[in-house]
Amino acid sequence: MSLPKKKIGIFAFFLLTVFTITLKTYFSYYVDFSLGVKGLVQNLILIMNPYSLIALVLSVFLFFKGKKAFWFIFIGGFLLTFLLYANVVYFRFFSDFLTFSTLNQAGNVESMGGAVSASFKWYDFVYFIDTIIYLAILIFKRKWLDNRAFSKKFVPVVMATSVALFFLNLAFAETDRPELLTRTFDHKYLVKYLGPYNFTVYDGVKTIENNQQKALASEDDLTKVLNYTKQKRTEPNPEYYGAAKKKNIIKIHLESFQTFLINKKVNGKEVTPFLNKLSSGNQDFTYFPNFFHQTGQGKTSDSEFTMDNSLYGLPQGSAYSLKGDNTYQSLPAILDQKQGYTSNVMHGDYKTFWNRDQVYKHFGIDNFYDATYYDMSDDNIVNLGLKDKPFFKASADYQSKMKKPFYSHLITLTNHYPFTLDEEDASIDKPNTGDSTVDGYIQTAHYLDQALEEYITDLKKKGLYDNSVIMIYGDHYGISENHNNAMEKLLGEKITPAKFTDLNRTGFWLKVPGKSGGVNKEYAGQMDVMPTLLHLVGIDSKNYLMFGSDMFSKQHNNVVPFRNGDFITEDYKYVNGKIYSNKDNELLTEKPKDFDKNKKQVEKDLEMSDSVLNGDLFRFYKNPDFKKVNPGKYEYKSGPKGNEKK
């Protein structure tokens, strides 16, 4: 490389760094982030939003002199690039953006190494090529740099321009998306309108506000929530109320399961033949085909949290990680106090993942059968932990010896991203979509279906089937929007935002002893499971704070809110600010009569649930029907025998 005729000055290096980082951010918008950008205004906003914070941050280093200025600008640029790339990798895996809250979950990343590494792409060098070039110049081609001081009078101009551009950006954003900063349920909106860097600043401010909320919370805040949830309560259905009193409850978590798999064939073979039978209505199970997950960033942990507490997860981060030491009125604790149930969770991963070993104590869960209770030899492990077949087999053995009635929650793992399976376990050919994630998903889902069938057979052999409520559900979507092209090949139809919402159906199957099965087409979500189960065992939900409604109730609320503020009803869905018909997923030209009421209810639900978590409001609840859980009572010893409740 020959010496350039004109050296690179400090200000020129600053402009070059701002330009290349901004360019990389544009690249991420269109290649990696699914932001749903439409129209001239939104594209103009994308052009503006990265520049303001990049320029403002890096302009601070213009006050330094000589080599220091070059190096500080470089380091600042590298940190911004690292933040961008971290968001890219995180988005590929979670379809969401990094927050300060998710940093508290960083310990989970080590356990998910294979899944995270699968998120890397061949073109990722684009995000670092400028950084490498600048570093090479700073180390090996210092003669190219002009270290002479330049007039600092330009620096305040740059800063003022950056701030002015931010407010102009915000004005455009508020015009296109009113109340953007007050209705902040969806991070994609915030990044689309503010950019990833301003979003990080905004998230930091919100995190501080939420931390202050607990200190300022009072019993009056709880009263407001109680008054609201009591108005939402639905009466139990007399036909089902108490039908399963003191029966065992077995809750089976199907990792990443989506119901587009039901009755789906690949190369002429059913992907989920056993679940297909359970979905027919001719078995012991009632199938809810319009059951949706309601998780946020916490994914699996949000699913557990919502179904055991009838509360929403957090808008940022995982409630397990951030609110694990709160006071709760959980389903396992209520079952114990009202009907003497023992409770346990069974999972082929280690107990510290998702902070479970601490959270479960606050839920009043008696026993935790983690990976130390299972044979974790190499032949039994794939992806994140224990394969489903040996997991189910060992779990059934443990359950056959449990004190009854018990509440047992089994969490599977094999059908987890990146959906890899040992050759000897694969018994269905992969489709050929050209996407290893989608193709692998078919094989791992088929394996999960086989494992589930073997487990149900074991329950029958061990005499547990007839006297147990058995609940099966998918915890969250498995295939994100990043794989829409492959999904279109697999399903043979266009994946629009409305269709992707339909794909968030994760299924719910429920066997109640003494009741025949069927198909229940009510629209419901994970929030509704807790009141449904309480009524089945004969415990009235009226004395407990819950946001869901009994799925068997004749007054069941068919509005299903999502964590980002979208929602779906029997007739239409609200997605990314637009309303679509459920019949054909076409955009509605007229607003439904009940739309404003439903939208207000969804926003109020999310707001109230957030206040419960951020204010730790259950600590103020004096409920004569519930004694607060003492987490100090619980200890989860390592296997093989554990600490079983006698």
Swiss-Prot record:
GO terms for molecular function: metal ion binding; transferase activity. Mn(2+) binds at residues 255, 300, 475-476. Catalyzes the polymerization of lipoteichoic acid (LTA) polyglycerol phosphate, a reaction that presumably uses phosphatidylglycerol (PG) as substrate. Is required for staphylococcal growth and cell division process. The gene is ltaS. Proteolytically cleaved. Pathway: Cell wall biogenesis; lipoteichoic acid biosynthesis. The record marks 217-218 as: Cleavage. The active site is at residue 300. Keywords: Cell membrane, Cell wall biogenesis/degradation, Manganese, Membrane, Metal-binding, Secreted, Transferase, Transmembrane, Transmembrane helix. The chain crosses the membrane at residues 8-28, 44-64, 69-89, 120-140, 154-174. Residues 1-7, 65-68, 141-153 are cytoplasmic. GO terms for cellular component: extracellular region; plasma membrane. Pfam families: Sulfatase. Its main location: membrane. Belongs to the LTA synthase family. GO terms for biological process: cell wall organization; lipoteichoic acid biosynthetic process. The keyword Transmembrane applies. Substrate binds at residue 416. It comes from Staphylococcus epidermidis (strain ATCC 12228 / FDA PCI 1200). InterPro entries: Alkaline_phosphatase_core_sf, LtaS-like, OpgB/LTA_synthase_biosynth, Sulfatase_N. This is Lipoteichoic acid synthase. It is found in: Cell membrane. Residues 29-43, 90-119, 175-646 are extracellular. The keyword Cell wall biogenesis/degradation applies. Gene3D superfamilies: 3.30.1120.170, Alkaline Phosphatase, subunit A. It is a multi-pass membrane protein. Its EC number is 2.7.8.-. It is an enzyme of class 2 (transferase).
